[in-house]
Amino acid sequence: MGSVRTNRYSIVSSEEDGMKLATMAVANGFGNGKSKVHTRQQCRSRFVKKDGHCNVQFINVGEKGQRYLADIFTTCVDIRWRWMLVIFCLTFILSWLFFGCVFWLIALLHGDLENQENNKPCVSQVSSFTAAFLFSIETQTTIGYGFRCVTDECPIAVFMVVFQSIVGCIIDAFIIGAVMAKMAKPKKRNETLVFSHNAVVAMRDGKLCLMWRVGNLRKSHLVEAHVRAQLLKSRITSEGEYIPLDEIDINVGFDSGIDRIFLVSPITIVHEIDEDSPLYDLSKQDMDNADFEIVVILEGMVEATAMTTQCRSSYLANEILWGHRYEPVLFEEKNYYKVDYSRFHKTYEVPNTPICSARDLAEKKYILSNANSFCYENEVALTSKEEDEIDTGVPESTSTDTHPDMDHHNQAGVPLEPRPLRRESEI
């Protein structure tokens, strides 16, 4: 127990390293027996970027400006803040200028600009365009300094004051509503929802599974959270039609309801590669040479605003690591659970993962090894226990139990005999 453990597992610490591992033939049974690196002559352009933005540009859209203006509220909510502020300022300035010109024309036609002594003006103290502009601002913003005011001499002036007040209320309601809707958008909530850099393919409960990890960096919950996934690839129909992006649903438990998750700690999403899976006929070598993209989607309601948010990411074929599992991130302490996000994107290699397709595995064309290898998660738990004993100054020789006591620092993800630990999906 006191000896230093050697690292028998390769750790993928970055997306770049993961891509290298995914495209290289590994010598210990992962490759095809030849020291050959599989590369693609044509690499698929990513349809959904890692940050969730769709890599799509629209061209030749007829009457685009008119269509956007017809839905001006959504346009204002979707545009950037700097353009929103420009629209905000221009709307008020133009309305003030318009009604300032109207009051100046009323004064001009009534002869108020000539300053005649016996002439009762339509708007008192308005003898220039500047004065008319200031009166327009005072009317719409209800400042009312008291020097300029409308009189009962001109009914048209009274009507314009009433009309400007109504228009000002409409502008205020529209601008405030657009700003509030833009501020309340759950778009920024996606910044605290993360997907793992790489997806993995490994055995789970005796079946070959595709897995990826999702996490919530906030303590506030995502209500009614659920996940979806689609595989995008090009294909040619039996009639010869070329479909550049054929969308195929990937089952993550919709029928059984396990697609709905309680996202408090990081969770590994599992897709069982069965006969209904689009990955059923893919072996490791086929995966290395494949050209497709898996789009993963996490949806839920923001707890603070009850608005629906959607977080997206994608994995190309060279970002799927065959024969890897994720490092454990959830640990059980004395009175709480601890999540270590430094391990969130890291994976380790599982040497006995079959390299055949799920179909060959189901048809018994590949014989699984019966050798039980010591699981890496158990090694993490044992190492953590040793560190606790060193920190507390308890000598290992004083322990009478041949198995380490895992009560104080259990990894909540892997069974360890003879005292089983709770699995990550059960917490």
UniProtKB/Swiss-Prot annotation:
Span(s) of short sequence motif Selectivity filter: 142-147
Disulfide bond annotation, renumbered to this chain: none
GO cellular component: membrane; monoatomic ion channel complex; plasma membrane; T-tubule
UniProt-annotated stretches for the region Polyphosphoinositide (PIP2)-binding: 181-208
Alphabetically ordered keywords of this record: Cell membrane, Ion channel, Ion transport, Membrane, Potassium, Potassium transport, Transmembrane, Transmembrane helix, Transport, Voltage-gated channel
Membrane topology: Multi-pass membrane protein
Molecular function, one GO term: inward rectifier potassium channel activity
Transmembrane segments: 82-106, 157-178
Locus of motif PDZ-binding: 425-427
Ranges for region Disordered: 386-427
Activity control note: Activated by phosphatidylinositol 4,5 biphosphate (PtdIns(4,5)P2).
One GO BP: potassium ion import across plasma membrane
Catalytic reactions of this protein: K(+)(in) = K(+)(out)
Subcellular location: Cell membrane; Cell membrane, Sarcolemma, T-tubule
Principal location class: membrane
Subunit structure: Homotetramer. Homomultimeric and heteromultimeric association with KCNJ4/Kir2.3, resulting in an enhanced G-protein-induced current. Associates, via its PDZ-recognition domain, with a complex containing LIN7A, LIN7B, LIN7C, DLG1, CASK and APBA1.
Protein's job: Inward rectifier potassium channels are characterized by a greater tendency to allow potassium to flow into the cell rather than out of it. Their voltage dependence is regulated by the concentration of extracellular potassium; as external potassium is raised, the voltage range of the channel opening shifts to more positive voltages. The inward rectification is mainly due to the blockage of outward current by internal magnesium. Can be blocked by external barium. Probably participates in establishing action potential waveform and excitability of neuronal and muscle tissues.
UniProt family annotation: Belongs to the inward rectifier-type potassium channel (TC 1.A.2.1) family. KCNJ2 subfamily.
Name of the protein described by the UniProt record: Inward rectifier potassium channel 2
The species this protein was found in: Gallus gallus (Chicken)
Gene name of this polypeptide: KCNJ2
